[in-house]
């Protein structure tokens, strides 16, 4: 995965993510869970500043997060909002994989 794909999968301009709609798209294929970061792309990319080789990094500050968790098949989800730190895999000074919430 690359930075552009990471942005499409994890960065949003709304806290009220329409989970049922977005998770049914070809980008997600009804996967069990996805976390969205409510932010402009620049602050998220800055997490990886100076990191070239693949490395997991925990944010130093908290972000608004929106989790879409599957509740039933096919493609029915519940939205859970939170504020927390998160961990990403950085490569070539950009996030390429969302590792998890709270810790690496």
Swiss-Prot record:
Residues with PTM Pyrrolidone carboxylic acid: 1
Residue pairs linked by disulfide bridges in the UniProt entry: 19-68, 30-75, 48-90, 87-104
Pfam families referenced in this protein's UniProt entry, alphabetically: RnaseA
UniProt-annotated catalytic positions: 10, 97
SMART domains in UniProt: RNAse_Pc (SM00092)
Top-level taxon of origin: Eukaryota
InterPro entries: RNaseA, RNaseA-like_dom_sf, RNaseA_AS, RNaseA_domain
The protein's Enzyme Commission number: 3.1.27.-
Keywords: Disulfide bond, Endonuclease, Hydrolase, Nuclease, Pyrrolidone carboxylic acid
PROSITE patterns registered for this protein in UniProt: RNASE_PANCREATIC (PS00127)
Single GO term (MF): endonuclease activity
Binding site for substrate: 31-35
One example of a Gene Ontology biological process annotation: defense response to Gram-positive bacterium
Functional summary from the UniProt entry: Basic protein with antiproliferative/cytotoxic activity against several tumor cell lines in vitro, as well as antitumor in vivo. It exhibits a ribonuclease-like activity against high molecular weight ribosomal RNA.
Protein family membership: Belongs to the pancreatic ribonuclease family.
Full protein name: Protein P-30
Organism field: Lithobates pipiens (Northern leopard frog)
